Amino acid sequence: WVRGEGYDPSLAPRGEFDAAWLDEIVPDRPVVLRAMDYHTAWVNTKALELAGITPETPQPLDGEILLRPDGTVLGTLREWGAWSMVYNLLPPLDNEQRHKAALAASAAFSSCGVTWAQDAWVEDDTLETWLLAAKSGALKFRANLAWFAEPEGVWKTKIDGFSKNRDRLAKEAPDLLT
């Protein structure tokens, strides 16, 4: 899998990105890119195939699979109901992969003068990454962390955990993480 985060969906007309554009670069491996708005994903044909997304796939209630004028799948998936069909197939990142990504992001942000950022999709495993980066001195900017809450209602069972994580941030890395 090739995965990426943070592309600007406004770079294509109507935010409609074509799987064929990714296929030209990576035709043999699934690619999934999450837009900076966290509401859109751009995927290649291989990812669509693995997810079983075809022109006959019913439109999800809480999402949209964009189609080309000829009825074929475009490669842009909007909202949870559509892009979760691909995201649920992604292999999990391990701690080392997440830590390397945090270091790369910190270096990139620092080189541009960024002093504050928000991560709008934090889960328990990524919390550990943020804390490690902050405690090790590798984090060179402040970050506001927002916990991911699944739209299907599972989030309601996680409210206590969200509160405990906030308390933990306040105790362990109050100068860098909020």
State what each model feature region is.
Residues W1-R166:
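Divalent metal-binding segments
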